[in-house]
UniProtKB/Swiss-Prot annotation:
Homodimer. Keywords: Cytoplasm, Methyltransferase, Nucleotide biosynthesis, Transferase. Its EC number is 2.1.1.45. It comes from Shewanella sp. (strain MR-4). The keyword Zinc does not apply. Gene3D superfamilies: Thymidylate synthase/dCMP hydroxymethylase domain. This is Thymidylate synthase. Catalyzes the reductive methylation of 2'-deoxyuridine-5'-monophosphate (dUMP) to 2'-deoxythymidine-5'-monophosphate (dTMP) while utilizing 5,10-methylenetetrahydrofolate (mTHF) as the methyl donor and reductant in the reaction, yielding dihydrofolate (DHF) as a by-product. This enzymatic reaction provides an intracellular de novo source of dTMP, an essential precursor for DNA biosynthesis.
Length: 264
């Protein structure tokens, strides 16, 4: 994951200091892209230990269409705790938009089911897109979508995915985002009987928080290690039937975890 370290270096060298919604302050660049060949290892950062269990459970939670953190809490995942209300609700965040985007007629669109059907029937379509950025419901969300929309692309029997992330916390959030969408691409590829292509990450406001600078320096002092392997142990009937136990991460030998505060 040298690409990830190169992004950090780029922000430190070329970024500008900006204020932000949280009041923390950031060093930021606008517009950056990384590409990961998913056939050459699973893109999970190795210069610090990442909590893959949380990444998997969060993705399964999105795919359930769930927007209450009870499932996450039951599985000891706390990454959404700061934004939930007293009942554990987050409003119509990712899961709601992915699985039940509301229409003017009162119906709802299951974007995940729809895009998989489209990949199977129209693999050359340029409309293989899922969006979480529902302008009409942003004010109801506890946090506006950071990873706003993603697009699939089929070529030579391989499935690729590109994510546009409008706002990116590079130290804490980005390793999760890359791994989550890489895993989602693997799952969709399996469901559509396609080989793995690339995961392309595109960032908008791409930043390091001012209170993550010491942690960033520590991470930059470490040498990346070989990427691990992610294996999906079975092919369930649909994208919605995967269980946590279906995923096996092997050969992950990261440097120690680096703790950092979350900007809320």
């Amino acid at each position: 994951m040298q690409q990830y370290l190169d992004l950090m270096k780029h922000i430190l060298a070329e970024g500008v200091d900006k204020s932000d919604r949280t009041g923390t302050g950031t060093r930021s660049v606008f517009g950056y892209q990384m590409r990961f060949d998913l056939s050459k290892g699973f893109p999970l950062v190795t210069t610090k230990k990442c909590h893959m269990r949380s990444i998997i459970h969060e993705l399964l939670w999105f795919l359930k269409g769930d927007t209450n953190i009870a499932y996450l809490r039951d599985n000891k995942v706390s990454i959404w705790d700061e934004w939930a209300d007293e009942n554990g609700d987050l409003g119509p965040v990712y899961g709601a938009q992915w699985r039940s985007w509301p229409t003017q007629s009162g119906d709802a669109i299951d974007q995940i089911a729809q895009v998989i059907a489209q990949i199977k029937s129209q693999p050359d379509s340029r409309r293989l897109i899922v969006s979480a950025w529902n302008v009409g419901e942003l004010d109801k969300m506890a946090l506006a979508p950071c990873h706003a929309f993603f697009q699939f692309y089929v070529a030579d029997g391989k499935l690729s995915c590109q994510l546009y992330q409008r706002s990116c916390d590079v130290f804490l959030g980005l390793p999760f985002n890359i791994a989550s969408y890489a895993l989602l691409t693997m799952m969709v590829a399996q469901q559509c009987d396609l080989a793995l292509g690339d995961f392309v990450w595109t960032g908008g406001d791409t930043h390091l928080y001012s209170n993550h600078m010491e942690q960033t320096a520590l991470q930059l002092s470490r040498e990346p290690r070989p990427l691990p392997t992610m294996t999906i142990l079975r092919k369930p009937a649909s994208i919605f039937d995967y269980q946590f136990e279906d995923f096996e991460l092997t050969n992950y030998d990261p440097h120690p975890h680096i703790k950092a505060p979350v900007a809320v």
